[in-house]
């Protein structure tokens, strides 16, 4: 089915949870590879562990890691060299996003609820964020249908008879 719809590859990103990704079967690995060969990309969601094999992520065509903004902050500890993540004590916390980018992976901080979290995410050099601060989730069906409605004055205009 996806082979027949490769024109969607630039618009579709498959999301998989970190634990599901870690527990993939060989069949799932092959299927991900096939989708990647068709141009589809992947995003790892529900990321809880930051000590990842970035080479493996790149080989699997994972292009995004979605990590909760609060989870990122909860993982930070102070070291003699400055802030680091517990799982990566040899890497400055502010260098984590750059490390991921070297492997073609962008970090998305999610569940950003207030401006304080935005500042904290920016201090980690993370370029993407999402959450209630940027707009609450909303039903899109009504909004999409409203965009396709004809203008109100068009609907209210009287019908004119043709002279003839």
Residues covered by each model-derived region:
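EAL-family c-di-GMP phosphodiesterase catalytic domain
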Residues: 11, 15-23, 40-164
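Short, charged low-complexity intrinsically disordered segments located at boundaries
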Residues: 1, 29-30, 129, 150
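Mobile, glycine- and charge-enriched loop segments
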Residues: 32-38, 42
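Short, flexible segments with low predicted structural confidence
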Residues: 7, 28, 91-93
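Active-site core of PLP-dependent enzymes with the aminotransferase class I/II
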Residues: 23-34
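Bacterial c-di-GMP phosphodiesterase EAL domain
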Residues: 1-7, 33, 98, 164
């Amino acid at each position: 089915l996806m082979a027949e719809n490769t024109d969607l590859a630039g618009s579709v990103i498959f999301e998989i949870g970190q634990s599901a990704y870690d527990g993939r079967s060989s069949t799932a690995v092959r299927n991900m590879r096939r989708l990647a060969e068709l141009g589809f990309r992947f995003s790892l969601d529900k990321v809880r562990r930051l000590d990842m094999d970035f080479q493996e992520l790149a080989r699997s065509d994972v292009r995004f890691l979605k990590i909760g903004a609060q989870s990122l902050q909860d993982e930070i500890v102070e070291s003699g060299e400055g802030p680091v993540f517990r799982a990566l004590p040899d890497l400055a916390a502010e260098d984590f996003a750059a490390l991921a980018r070297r492997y073609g992976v962008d970090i998305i901080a999610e569940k950003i609820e207030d401006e304080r979290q935005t500042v904290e995410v920016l201090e980690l050099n993370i370029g993407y964020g999402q959450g209630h601060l940027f707009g609450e989730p909303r039903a899109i069906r009504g909004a999409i249908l409203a965009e396709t409605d004809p203008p109100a004055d068009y609907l209210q205009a009287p019908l004119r008879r043709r002279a003839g």
